[in-house]
Structure formats: C-alpha cells, structure tokens
Amino acid sequence: MYNMFYGCTSLKELNLNNFNTNNVTNIGYMFSGCSSLKELNINNFNTNNVKYMGGIFNGCSSLKEFNLNKFNTNNVTDMNCMFFECSSLKELNLNNFNTNNVNDMGCMFHGCSSLKKNKS
C-alpha cells in the first residue's frame, strides 16, 4: 500500500473502512501529497503487521483532525515525516501509539503549525 494515493491532489474525501489490511506491512506515504483531502475514514484499518508508517500523511495540508486510536503500532519501526506539513491539523489522538520499536521519528510533526492538542 506504499504510495497508494501519493500525489492525488484533487482527492477531497476517502472512505477506506472496507479495505482488508490484515497482511499489510508498509503504509508509508500512502496519502502523501493529498493536499485537498479533508475527510479520511480509516477507522477499521488493521495495522497489526505494519512496520513502516513513514510519511503516511505527509503533505495532507487540508486534514484538520482524524482519529488513529485503533492504530496498532506495536511493530512499527519507522514513523518519520508521518504528519509532515499537515498544516491544518488541529487535534490528534495518539493515546494508543506504542513507540517502543520505533527507530525513526524525525520530522514527524514538522510544519504542523495548527496542532493544538493531543486528544486524550
């Protein structure tokens, strides 16, 4: 699923609730460059086997909030640039994020100038 929607600059909303992601290990840069994306539903993503999440939301500058509290990050080793330049992002729930195995979180929140709180 790496780069799956990369550069889809006209994409405004996306519902991927029915995607089967049980065996996916790499979701890096999946939505990178989707600068018009305002609504994203990935609430049912199974991320149990994911190791690479780097840049998944990189450049999603129109997203204001989304909930990742069902994301299982136990096996993730790379989260670099995950929310890079998500300049409209105001709230983010990362309460369930386990970063014990993460080696790279560089620039994870770079350019998130509107981010005000971590929903708890």
What do these predicted regions represent?
Residues 2-120:
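Negatively charged
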